[in-house]
Amino acid sequence: MSLSSPQRPTEQLDLFRALPGDMAPRDSQDLMAYPFFSLAKSRRTKPIDFRSGNVAIRVEGTQEHGIATIWDADILIWAASQIVEARDAGITTSRLMRARPYEILRFIGRGVSLRDYQRLKAALDRLQSTTVATSIRETTGRRLHRFSWINEWKELADARGTPLGIELILPDWFYAGVLDAALVLTIDPAYFDLTGGIERWLYRLVRKHGGHQPGGWQFDFKHLHRKSGSTAKPHDFACDLRALVARQSMPGYRLGIVRMPGTGAEVLTFRPVPPTAQG
């Protein structure tokens, strides 16, 4: 499927062909820190609305596709990884990218069956049809930048109909953030093995805020629920957090729960775990 968009024509962009081989996965810090994606595998059509200080975010999806999910965002992690790898190697990059589906699927830890390919196309459809309005990186905090996660994408084939891969165009907002080295972090490849939406979202938040600080970081449950954009009730969300602490499945980090003196409010703590101590 090829989805159109009122963006500037494809021919005005240079083509960036995906690089072969393994590379470290990189993620955009803005996407790690704020609620841009649905955390549910079921279709979500309720908009995500988030405001904190000068930061405003509104994410909307269509009735047909719903809002792009945190699993769909793996494609953006692949794109960011490609762009950073090429930039560091002195290779010219572009918002217009071409790749073979199996290259993307392999990188994000998926299978390469027909069903996996169909799921990849469905993810691309959700990324293209999801609209975002945000004040992040807008200097006044009052102006909103509006875009879709993918401006457009299409399947390629030769004259005989033999598949040649896919092309996609990334939005300026995402592309500019990835090119800024200060706005990108390397993530653990084990992230792609995480199966839960809240689990995946929490890893990205922990990686963004905890980094490699020896003392770690902490957030109260109420703040985490608000920052996740989750539609889960606070009680259910808290249960999910407690289950994650009990499971200790977060790559590179150890989670804990403490209660605030006086209020008794639960606080999630996290700190880096030395590689030798990771199971």
Residues covered by each model-derived region:
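Charged, alpha-helix-forming regions
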Residues: M1-G279
